[in-house]
C-alpha cells in the first residue's frame, strides 16, 4: 500500500546551503549527477518525482514496496529519520533534525537532480 503524502508545510530552502549539507552528509554514499556512479547508495539524479526504489540499484524491499513518489513533503519527513519513515530501508543516515536544514537540502536535491 502506498504511503500517503504527509500533511506538512515545507519551508523555503536555500540550495546553496543545501549543497554544503549534501557534501558533508550525503556525498560519501550518493552521487547526484547524470551518469554518476552508484556508491553505497544510489545515484540521486532524476529521483525527484520518481517512485522510490525504481532505479538500477539493489534497493530493499521496503523501499521498492513503499509506494512513495519523492516529493518535498515525503523528503521533509523522511529526512528526519529514514529508518523510521521506511522501516527496512538500507539508508544508514541518522537524519537531519532541523527543519531548515531539511528544507535547504531538499531545495538543493531538486535543483541538482534535474541538471
From Swiss-Prot:
UniProt GO molecular function: electron transfer activity; heme binding; metal ion binding
Keywords: Electron transport, Heme, Iron, Metal-binding, Mitochondrion, Respiratory chain, Transport
Post-translational modification: Binds 1 heme c group covalently per subunit.
UniProt GO cellular component terms: mitochondrial intermembrane space
Residues noted as binding heme c in the record, renumbered to the chain: 26, 29-30, 91
Entry superkingdom: Eukaryota
Localization (cell): Mitochondrion intermembrane space
Record InterPro entries: Cyt_c-like_dom, Cyt_c-like_dom_sf, Cyt_c_1A/1B
Entry keyword Transport: yes
Function: Electron carrier protein. The oxidized form of the cytochrome c heme group can accept an electron from the heme group of the cytochrome c1 subunit of cytochrome reductase. Cytochrome c then transfers this electron to the cytochrome oxidase complex, the final protein carrier in the mitochondrial electron-transport chain.
UniProt family annotation: Belongs to the cytochrome c family.
Designated name of the protein: Cytochrome c
Species: Theileria annulata
